[in-house]
């Protein structure tokens, strides 16, 4: 053991490259790798500046992660800029949710609701999911294990402090931490949509036009969160002349006739066909509102919905309408 002088603190790591790996000695290739995998780690990565007459070093990574900063220190513009960076979308998001979880499990999430549906939204096997980081180190794109399929339009980042750096897609499918994060992030995404629906009805209407059909799938696929999904639904209705889907179940309940116990709806090939259906005649005469559904998935998803706030949902094309106090002897049987 002897004492030696070292110009700087730290550890020197020398990497010897094989002949078929010389590309990793190329400065441009190295910069690209650093920016992809280590752009957000807490430490600066420096490389010799290209074209400098003397040896100069420059930082090639950001050395910070926006999602690790306190929400109070991040501006709306920074959130929007980061969304465009990770999504390659030119439009600002409709909403976002930034959260840090500490305790038994530690992770940070930053979720976004896009303004427009991607071209492959209806390709259920297409690329989807969040960008996954572990302790700020980039792991993979399209980590689809953290949100259910009906929320495939959500963009964002999940950064875990508990997962191993060498995590694989196979390991993600069999991990208790991932299951817990999936449940929590699903709740967080639905809370974000609920807040948007109450705080900005116009923006939520824009969201529904783009993603409403996908969100409906959750009624069938995610029974645990059905009660959170039901208030988010929007329908066309006989109370409106237009076929705009802007009526919530809460709106319907608030307009119930005296003595009316059920929520009535009708499924048809189009809203126009629904409006001209003979099944509506009796209810129109009694001034009872009927929700009009015309999506291809409606027959499938509405089979999973039985009631809302104590009121049964009844398809007017099937069986007894159970009008109760609103019935009269002149009504057809």
Stretch-by-stretch model annotation:
Residues 1-333:
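Conserved GHKL (Bergerat-fold) ATPase module
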